[in-house]
């Protein structure tokens, strides 16, 4: 699992009343961290050849204007083109393999963790719940456990991959993180209305639509974690990517921003102490993840990341407003891509499937 924990499970979370019983050749290849200082940026920009991302690599493309050219334009990129997806570069065999792996993982997850008669998920949750009778405390503990495991394994990724390889480490990472994420999500769904009510806004006209729209938008920030699904499933060799286009121009840490938007919207809607506890845990985890992510990218990409960092921002739109980020004239085209279309359709579909998702969650004694 490459993404951070999200209580949406690839869906816009419910805002319903409770019913419960090309781009430039990168200055640093993805797989080869920079070990020597880069030449001055002005020199790089004057000699760099514009390029476009194709699949997992980069190939030259004419006609893209680099900074310093007579016709003007945005700076040559040091990172990768996010959400680049071309059908001609896809392998049917790879996606069939991905589907098979996904099916096997879901079956194993159900048998070994979710099913109370065969899995250990219920015993794990009982052990955590034995610490306190407070749903708020248990909710916070679950997010902390997930955060420690998820961020800890991400931090150890470089060392771990040297020992067991990229694919094996990704399988271990997902195999440990996914059950913990599912447990936290199900517990939140089952107990989100069990806390102390702090405010009530569900009857206010227009609040549902406002918060639903906020949750929907949050997924365009959260999505970069799955730009490379074949790598998530270890079909392709996993890499530590340094994205630079699309949503990354708005904020360098879209997952953190998306999670904050999601948490604020749902905490306002639910309005109780359990929602507050979940949001505190998740936002804290993602704030640490933003710092840790910068640290890992700096370690892997060196000066190239420093260049990217100077022209991006953590706070949404800050780099654009103060002029450090120069949006290309056709910036909107960076969103008119199949991955963004797919996430839009899946998010809408999952939202309308929330009654089924809730019913499945309520069947578990979690």
Curated annotation (Swiss-Prot):
Its EC number is 5.2.1.12. Residues 1-45 form a transit peptide. InterPro entries: NnrU_dom. The keyword Isomerase applies. One of its GO terms (cellular component) is chloroplast membrane. It comes from the Eukaryota. Gene3D superfamilies: 1.20.120.1630. Keywords: Chloroplast, Isomerase, Membrane, Plastid, Transit peptide, Transmembrane, Transmembrane helix. GO terms for biological process: carotene biosynthetic process. The chain crosses the membrane at residues 94-114, 136-156, 171-191, 203-223, 260-280, 338-358. It is a multi-pass membrane protein. Disulfide bonds: none annotated. Its main location: plastid. It catalyses: 9,9',15-tri-cis-zeta-carotene = 9,9'-di-cis-zeta-carotene. GO terms for molecular function: 9,15,9'-tri-cis-zeta-carotene isomerase activity. It is an enzyme of class 5 (isomerase). Expressed in leaves and roots, and at lower levels in embryos and endosperm. It is found in: Plastid, Chloroplast membrane. Isomerase involved in the biosynthesis of carotenoids. Catalyzes the cis- to trans-conversion of the 15-cis-bond in 9,15,9'-tri-cis-zeta-carotene. This is 15-cis-zeta-carotene isomerase, chloroplastic.
């Amino acid at each position: 699992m490459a993404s951070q924990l999200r209580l949406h499970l690839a869906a816009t979370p419910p805002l319903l009343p409770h019913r419960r019983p090309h781009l430039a050749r990168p200055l640093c290849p993805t797989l080869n961290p920079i070990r020597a200082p880069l030449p001055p940026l002005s020199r790089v920009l004057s000699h760099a050849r514009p390029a476009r991302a194709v699949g997992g690599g980069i190939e030259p493309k004419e006609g893209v204007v680099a900074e310093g050219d007579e016709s003007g334009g945005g700076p040559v990129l040091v990172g990768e083109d996010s959400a680049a997806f071309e059908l001609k570069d896809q392998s049917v065999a790879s996606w069939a393999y991905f589907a098979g792996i996904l099916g096997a993982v879901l079956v194993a997850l159900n048998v070994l963790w979710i099913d109370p008669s065969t899995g250990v998920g219920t015993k794990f949750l009982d052990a955590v719940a034995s610490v306190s009778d407070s749903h708020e405390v248990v909710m916070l503990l679950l997010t902390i456990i997930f955060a420690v495991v998820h961020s800890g394994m991400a931090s150890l990724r470089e060392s771990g991959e040297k020992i067991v390889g990229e694919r094996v480490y990704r399988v271990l990472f997902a195999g440990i993180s996914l059950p913990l994420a599912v447990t936290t999500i199900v517990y939140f769904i089952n107990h989100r209305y069990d806390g102390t009510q702090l405010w009530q806004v569900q009857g206010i006209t227009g609040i549902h639509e406002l918060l639903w729209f906020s949750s929907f938008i949050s997924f365009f920030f959260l999505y970069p974690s799955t730009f490379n699904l074949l790598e998530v499933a270890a079909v392709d060799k996993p890499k530590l990517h340094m994205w630079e286009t699309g949503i990354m121009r708005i904020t360098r840490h879209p997952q953190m921003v998306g999670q904050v938007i999601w948490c604020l919207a749902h905490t306002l809607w639910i309005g109780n102490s359990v929602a507050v506890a979940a949001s505190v845990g998740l936002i804290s985890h993602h704030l640490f993840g933003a710092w840790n992510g910068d640290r890992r990218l700096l370690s892997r990409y060196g000066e190239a990341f420093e260049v990217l960092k100077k022209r991006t921002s953590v706070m949404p739109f800050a780099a654009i407003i103060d002029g450090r980020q120069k949006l290309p004239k056709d910036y909107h085209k960076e969103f008119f891509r199949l991955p963004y279309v797919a996430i839009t359709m899946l998010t809408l579909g999952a939202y309308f499937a929330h009654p089924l998702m809730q019913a499945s969650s309520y069947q578990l004694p979690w």
